[in-house]
């Protein structure tokens, strides 16, 4: 197994242009596919999850042209649904942002489609989405365990009507349903059961749908109306914002060891909820400066916080490791959906924080972290989870440094993360 040793870092300073957002990249690729016209996507993320989506679209007959560095894509829309005369089997790795939306989109047309992935994907639930699609007439068959991939779709289109979908596990299910609803045969009324988690991710979806010409009536996130007869139309160009979750590591670095760290590609005009991570750093005592498309973090002594972070679940992981450098006990609440991500992130985070000496209480949907007097060095297991590797890079700011196991797992969203991280040092 590959290991990366991060030696102690005294101070960080510099500027990082954040690569494109994973959430926006895969949503935009699918909407561009369903749209009339050709769409040019710029600042597209070049990572494993996006490659799985692109490979699947190509297999489904979508024509696109990628730039040499894979960050610009010119895609010819189908002007409607995806159909195939021959049976198709698509491998989607561990890419939830490809599996869930494609599962929904492939029910719209005609054909037989089988969706598979890595072993971890077979443990990531999709039942709430499939239950909703079945209410609209979809024929979806699980191939192993009910409620989980792999699965086969025998597509004949979706009817309109009323549909209920659970919102308390993952917002990706609602995102997938929203994106396909305009192409159903009739108007769709979506009723959300339970408290909707990660609402800012739904805002990303609605903003992109509007960019492609579709209107959704949002009744306070409890009900969504999508009138029949709408069509996605290419806006011509789509600029993919920098990934706000990826920005969190560099902003935390500035807060812990700044110096001054500036991230560009996200700012106060961002449609991503994870930019609110900077507000949490500010509550902890960091000096934060906002621009339209940049955020600056400057360091100071951090103090612990006790907050509901359901609205920023991915970026909240960075608070868990930043908490090691804060005075007091930090509590991150309402984060049950950490458990159904690339790994069970609550269990993984608790295990690895204890390795470096932290006192950790792991609840069903919260984590409580008290930093040790002296942070220990350790070998950090990353569980094939990109965010575990990037979060624990913060331990380079301890006096003893840290070793990251399987550092290349960052290829899921940020292949050159550690190179960029090193550029801030000195």
Curated annotation (Swiss-Prot):
Active site positions: 314
Matches recorded under InterPro entries: Enolpyruvate_Tfrase_dom, Enolpyruvate_Tfrase_sf, EPSP_synthase, EPSP_synthase_CS, RNA3'P_cycl/enolpyr_Trfase_a/b
Gene: aroA
Domain of life: Bacteria
Protein name: 3-phosphoshikimate 1-carboxyvinyltransferase
Residues reported to bind phosphoenolpyruvate: 22, 96, 124, 172, 345, 387, 412
Keyword Amino-acid biosynthesis among UniProt keywords: yes
GO BP annotations listed: amino acid biosynthetic process; aromatic amino acid family biosynthetic process; chorismate biosynthetic process
Organism encoding this protein: Shewanella baltica (strain OS185)
EC number: 2.5.1.19
SUPFAM superfamilies according to UniProt: EPT/RTPC-like (SSF55205)
Quaternary structure and partners: Monomer.
A Pfam short name: EPSP_synthase
């Amino acid at each position: 197994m590959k290991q990366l040793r991060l030696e102690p870092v005294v101070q960080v300073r510099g500027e990082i242009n954040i690569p494109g957002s994973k959430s926006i990249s895969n949503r935009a690729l699918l909407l561009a596919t369903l749209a009339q016209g050709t769409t040019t996507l710029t600042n597209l993320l070049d990572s494993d999850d996006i490659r799985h989506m692109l490979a699947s679209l190509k297999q489904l007959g979508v024509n696109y042209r990628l730039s040499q560095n894979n960050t610009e894509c010119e895609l010819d829309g189908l002007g409607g649904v995806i159909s195939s005369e021959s049976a198709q089997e698509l491998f989607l790795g561990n890419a939830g942002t490809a599996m869930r939306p494609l599962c929904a989109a492939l029910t719209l047309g005609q054909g037989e489609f089988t969706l598979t992935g890595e072993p971890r994907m077979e443990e990531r639930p999709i039942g709430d989405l499939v239950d909703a699609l079945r209410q609209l007439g979809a024929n979806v068959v699980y191939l192993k365990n009910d409620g989980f991939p792999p699965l086969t779709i025998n597509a004949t289109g979706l009817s309109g009507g009323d549909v209920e979908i659970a919102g308390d596990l993952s917002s990706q299910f609602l995102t997938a349903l929203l994106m396909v609803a305009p192409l159903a045969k009739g108007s769709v009324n979506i009723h959300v059961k339970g408290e909707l988690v990660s609402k800012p991710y739904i805002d990303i979806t609605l903003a992109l749908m509007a960019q492609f010409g579709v209107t959704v009536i949002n009744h306070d996130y409890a009900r969504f109306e999508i009138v029949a007869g709408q069509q996605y139309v290419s806006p011509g160009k789509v600029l993919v914002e920098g990934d706000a979750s990826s920005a969190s590591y560099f902003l935390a670095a500035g807060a812990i060891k700044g110096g001054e760290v500036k991230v560009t590609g996200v700012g106060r005009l961002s449609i991503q909820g994870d930019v609110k991570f900077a507000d949490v750093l500010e509550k902890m005592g960091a000096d934060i400066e906002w621009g339209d498309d940049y955020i600056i973090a400057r360091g100071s002594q951090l103090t612990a916080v006790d907050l509901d972070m359901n609205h920023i679940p991915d970026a909240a992981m960075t608070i868990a490791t930043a908490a090691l450098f804060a005075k007091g006990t930090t509590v991150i609440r309402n984060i049950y959906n950490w458990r159904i991500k690339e790994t069970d992130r609550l269990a993984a985070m608790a295990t690895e924080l204890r390795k470096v000496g932290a006192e950790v209480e792991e609840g069903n949907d919260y984590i409580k972290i008290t930093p040790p007097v002296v942070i220990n060095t350790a070998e950090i297991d990353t569980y094939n989870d990109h965010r575990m590797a990037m979060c624990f890079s913060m331990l380079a700011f301890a006096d003893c440094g840290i070793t990251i196991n399987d550092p290349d797992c960052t290829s899921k969203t940020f292949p050159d993360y550690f190179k960029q991280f090193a550029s801030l040092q000195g």
